[in-house]
Amino acid sequence: MNRRDALRYSLGAGLSALTYPTFGQTKVANNRFRIGACDWSIGPAGDIKSFAIAKQIGLDGVQVSLNTASDHEHLRKPELQRLMKEAAQQAGVQIGGLAIGMLNQIPYKSDPRTEAWVQDSVDVAKALGVKNILLAFFSNNDLKNDPKGTQIVIERLKAVAPKAEKAGVVLGIESWLSAPEHLAILDAVGSPAVKVYYDVCNSSDMGYDIFSEIRTLGKDRICEVHLKENGYLIGQGKVNLPKVKQALDDIGYAGWLHLEGAVPKGKPMLESYIENNRTVRSLFA
């Protein structure tokens, strides 16, 4: 997720039903990896129809949004959780993760409302049966060169970490920070329930050596991974996907790989994601 991706959260409305046939293969890539997509990349954030779309693409799951600009409660409501689980079951697609992208607009580092969001997200994740919660730190929530905001986030994460530990849930920090900067936060919080949500494209945009960073953080500090491109299909942009695979192999990472962005200008989303899915499966199978 980045600043541009964050804008997609403001949509929050229903997407017209699609009637395309299923093109992809939904079989899990292997025992190590499951391939999903962010709901805001394949439709409006929070749209329950994302599971049917994911099925058409051939994905294993969807990373769903906790809330949207038009509904700050959304999945904090038990009825919405029930409907989301039913939609996933009907599509034969998993709920692959939870994300709080609204933190980009209403920042965790300064707005007291977000403390309840993050606390409640632990309960929501447990109810949905997911392990990892993405906490977005871009736009208004950017921590880069903000020691005061970073310290507030550390204190808030310390407060929620025991609850996450007890629930068996992990809070993942996705930001513009480097691996050493992330590690400083993780060490300050001091909880196995707070890790890094690693986005290979964002870190490439920042000029970091993503392959070294992946190895530095290791599987114990990376909770989940975004495979993303901006304006290109996955595998055709700036990120060297085979080298990402090698780095993940080297640290023994296993889990979800969620696709994000990766829709070239003028190319339909569905067509793009069918191709993105095939590309990732061909390498990670």
Predicted regions and their residues:
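Glycine-rich, proline-tolerant flexible connector loops at the mouths of alpha/beta enzymes
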Residues: 65-84, 140-144
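Active-site-proximal loop/turn and secondary-structure-junction residues that shape catalytic pockets
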Residues: 41, 66-68, 101-104, 137-141, ...
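A generic structural signal for short coil/turn motifs at secondary-structure boundaries
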Residues: 71-74, 107-108, 144, 232-235, ...
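Charged helix-capping and loop-helix junction motifs
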Residues: 77-83, 111-119, 146-157, 209-215, ...
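Active-site acidic/histidine proton-transfer and metal-coordination neighborhood
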Residues: 10-21, 25-27, 49-51, 87-94, ...
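Conserved long hydrophobic alpha-helices within structured protein cores
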Residues: 55-64, 130
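Hydrophobic faces of well-ordered beta-strands that scaffold small-molecule active sites
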Residues: 33-38, 62-64, 95-100, 133-135, ...
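Histidine-acidic metal/acid-base catalytic patches
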Residues: 2-34, 43-57, 179-285
